[in-house]
Amino acid sequence: MRWPPWASNTQASNNDHPTTTNNNDPKNLLDWSAFTELRTLIPTLVLTTGILSAFTLHRNYLRRFPTAVNITPAYYRRRSILGKVTSVGDGDNFRIYHTPGGRLAGWGWVPWKKVPTTRKELRDQTIHVRIAGVDAPEQAHFGRPAQPFGKEAHEWLTGYLINRRVRIYVHRQDQYQRVVATVFVRRALDFPVPFRRRDVGYEMLRKGLATVYEAKVGAEFGGEVMEKKYRSAEWWAKARGLGLWKGFKKNRDAWESPREFKTRTGMEDVGDGKK
């Protein structure tokens, strides 16, 4: 039926067939307005924030570094790493198993967070640490003779650190895939203050078990303040003839520092490479 008179055939045809809706259109299948309601928005925001916070927490504080090369530069001179000492290679280097978060994160008491004990389990899973700012006498390596007090320095460091938790402040990585770091440890039987935090490098210098690191390149102390502190500790031991300085007082001409000994024997400062 054509009404009004001026209406076209096309218009009349369109009016005779009502408009249909495409039920296959996703826009018609979902009620998008539901996503803007507070009862939906708030739980979604809380869940998203929680997931992002957990990811950030794990990435910044709970991520475990298997070896020194895995440590990101963001840690250098800014962050510390907590770990358990698994072996002592020489008088100034050792290896730790990184335990991020420590006991609060379950290390030592949660069944699946235990430090391995066998060499096979520890292989490629420990961080090789070179104590910053100190140079200990060398042990016998690769057929070369040991330096006086090399054995004593190694035995002292082993007894002081092995199987203990230490905190290392990483300064950089060296050419031997080790991290050069200032090392701190707490010991229950530390007289006169139990659990006092001790600077391991400083303690070695005070006891005459090491000298200040004297290489022309690569020396790292963690700042001028630490360097002055270490040189003062060395002076203390030297003035009293402690440890390796006994030989210095007896015969200065024949005495060799760890650096001079390495130069004379051609011994590289690489430790023993134990895992």
Curated annotation (Swiss-Prot):
Keywords: Calcium, Endonuclease, Hydrolase, Membrane, Metal-binding, Mitochondrion, Nuclease, Transmembrane, Transmembrane helix
Catalytic residue positions: R130, E138, R178
Enzyme Commission numbers on file: 3.1.-.-
Region described as Disordered: spans on this chain: 1-25
Transmembrane segments: 41-57
Primary residence: mitochondrion
UniProt-listed PROSITE patterns: TNASE_3 (PS50830)
Residues given in the record as Ca(2+) binding sites: D135
Subcellular location: Mitochondrion; Membrane
Coiled coil, from the record: none
Annotated GO MF terms: endonuclease activity; metal ion binding
Highest taxon of the lineage: Eukaryota
Composition bias, Low complexity: 14-25
Positions of the TNase-like domain: 79-247
Membrane topology term: Single-pass membrane protein
Cellular component annotations (GO), alphabetically ordered: membrane; mitochondrion
Family statement: Belongs to the LCL3 family.
PANTHER family: EBNA2 BINDING PROTEIN P100 (PTHR12302), SERINE_THREONINE-PROTEIN KINASE 31 (PTHR12302:SF3)
Identification of the protein by name: Probable endonuclease lcl3
